[in-house]
Amino acid sequence: YYTGGCVAGAKALPIDGAEWQAMRLSRNRYWGTPKLVETIEQLAREGRALDGWPGLLVGDLGQPRGGPTPSDHISHQSGLDVDIWFDPMPDRRLSEEERETISATSLLVPGTNYELDMDKWPEGLDRVLKRAAGYPQVQRILVNPGVKKLLCDRAGDDRAWLSKIRPWYKHDDHFHMRLRCPKGGKTCRSQNPPPAGDGCGVGLDYWFSEVPWK
């Protein structure tokens, strides 16, 4: 399962591609199933070619053999999860030092849980998230509730993809993309699919209510 397991035959995401750069290299968390690596590369290529997105800054995948990480994650254990920064890739190669020290940009107004600062919203982010959600191998994408609400408000009539965009704590500086278990993976247990519908109604309202987050 995503929060308890390991991975055999993991593949390393190349730390540099024409449309992506891996971050926090010292953690050695750029390993995943071949399908996860393939999907990241596909999103990076198509995001640039079709959505005007300069490229991906890729955060943590998992460790070479999966399993629990020393910090930051409960999931990312089975080679099916990746964090991708909301920041677009710059038009130059970042140094090793920059990849360790630069922080992902929060899209929130400081001191708030879900209020977006639209001056920080990158052009094309909507399209990249929609593209990722449209991949059949993607099980769900976790984002801050404020990001989910904005996508709901902007989506128009084409809304089926929104069901995979799930509001979750934090996730204000990156999105968490999770793949389904690979076909034939008898030892892999997938998460239940997202509820039917676009997820923009009562389920989203909870995050903006006075009820404390659980």
Model-derived features: where do they sit?
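Glycine-centered flexibility motif
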Residues: 1-9, 67, 79, 106-108, ...
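Catalytic cores and adjacent binding grooves of peptidoglycan-active enzymes
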Residues: 94-214
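Long, contiguous hydrophobic alpha-helical segments, chiefly transmembrane helices and signal peptides
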Residues: 56-62, 82-86, 143, 175-179, ...
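Active-site acidic/histidine clusters and adjacent loop/turn architecture
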Residues: 1-58, 120-131, 135
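Extended, low-complexity, intrinsically disordered C-terminal regulatory tails
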Residues: 39-71, 142-164
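Acidic/His-rich structured neighborhood in mature extracellular/periplasmic domains
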Residues: 63-117
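Envelope-exposed proteins and targeting segments
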Residues: 52-57, 78-82, 137, 171-175
